[in-house]
A protein has these predicted regions:
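Short alpha-helix boundary/capping and kink motifs at helix termini
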Residues: 55-116, 126-127, 133
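Residues immediately within or flanking Cys/His clusters that coordinate Zn2+
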Residues: 27
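Cysteine-cluster motifs in flexible loop/terminal segments that predominantly coordinate metals
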Residues: 30
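General secretory precursor processing signal
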Residues: 20, 33-36, 78
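Short Lys/Arg-rich cationic patches that frequently serve as NLS/NoLS or arginine-rich RNA/DNA-binding motifs
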Residues: 2-23
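Basic- and aromatic-enriched surface patches that contact anionic nucleotides/nucleic acids
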Residues: 109-164
Length: 164
């Protein structure tokens, strides 16, 4: 005969196991889970960032920064978010912010940031009321991972291969 509370613990463990199995199946069947080389396109792919290289760069031990909720909402609102993908992304992993340069509406050269990795995790954090963190690339690192687009001095990069 199980001890008091043991039956509930066993049931809870079985439920967690089933939930993890379901999430694994969701990931395996998700058309949006990355397979192979990953890039991030911004502004209809006028800018393309090498996400795999960015992940290697930020694995250097740097600390992520917590983004303000309004900034997270801006990133999510300006991304293509697939609702069926949100439930099985893990919000504990930080995203990656890169630098972005380009002409403003008045023709002046502007500088900002773009979330190149973690938009679905950011959406999940917003939905679930969790904080969202991201690693920040330097300007040099951002140009290093820029496969297509304008750099900080107006230099245009086009390092796309036929596989991108």
């Amino acid at each position: 005969m199980p001890l008091k509370g043991e039956k509930n613990r066993q049931k809870s463990t079985k439920q967690r196991s089933k939930s993890l199995q379901t999430k694994k199946q969701d990931r395996e069947n998700c058309p949006h889970c990355a397979t192979g080389a990953e890039t991030y396109g911004y502004l209809k792919r006028a800018y393309v960032y090498d996400v795999d290289l960015a992940r290697k760069i930020v694995s250097d031990g740097r600390e992520p920064v917590e983004l303000e909720r309004d900034d997270v909402a801006y990133c999510v609102d300006n991304s293509r978010i697939h609702q069926q993908h949100i439930d099985h992304v893990n919000p504990k992993y930080p995203g990656i912010l890169g630098h972005l340069w380009g002409p403003g509406e008045d023709g002046t050269w502007e500088h900002g940031h773009v979330l190149i990795d973690g938009n679905h995790r950011a959406a999940r954090c917003l939905r679930d009321g969790l904080p969202f963190q991201a690693y920040l690339l330097s300007e040099d690192e951002s140009e290093q991972i820029l496969k297509r687009g304008a750099g900080r001095n107006g230099q245009v990069y086009d390092r796309m291969s036929k596989d991108d």
